[in-house]
Amino acid sequence: MSVTISAASADDAEHILKLQYLCYQSEAELYGDYSIEPLTQSLDDLKAEIARGHALVARLGDEVVASVRGEVDETGTARIGKLIVHPRLQGHGLGGRLLDAIEQHFARDTGPAAKRFRLFTGHRSDGNLRLYRRKGYETVGTERINPRLTVVTLEKAA
């Protein structure tokens, strides 16, 4: 069975939220903070986020096994976030495929065209940082949130 990538709909929201909760457990453990937004986001908030921007899901058969979402702001910055891959499928290139797919969407979107892609992750999230740098992202800033977490912002031209 192969993995297919398609646009997410409101009907996918519950599956995405469950996957998000599963995937962000390791991030919460890494930073010692289980109150992070991906673990506290409500279903209604997720549905609104999907409606406001663009979201993709990857399916293995009928199962949602990965997702990413984002939106383009008024300056032409495509803010990409919550790139998640089911733990059993991590390390097989699915995250990179999803990142490529959402970048392609924003580069040709009928709305405001993306001039740049921006995303962020925690400073200890080595796998995320490796993926983003391999995909051409460069660090453009850091912000210390608390003693355990510094957020790294990465960007690349569209």
Task: Please place each PLM-identified region on the residue numbering.
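Short, low-complexity, intrinsically disordered N-terminal peptides in bacterial proteins
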Residues: 1-4, 158
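Acetyl-CoA-dependent GNAT
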Residues: 10-13, 17-88, 96-111, 123, ...
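Glycine-rich phosphate-binding loop
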Residues: 93
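Short acidic/polar active-site loop segments enriched in Thr and Asp
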Residues: 115, 138
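Conserved beta-strand-loop-alpha-helix junction that forms the acyl-donor binding cleft
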Residues: 118-129, 145-149
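Conserved active-site tyrosine of GNAT-family acetyltransferases
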Residues: 132, 137
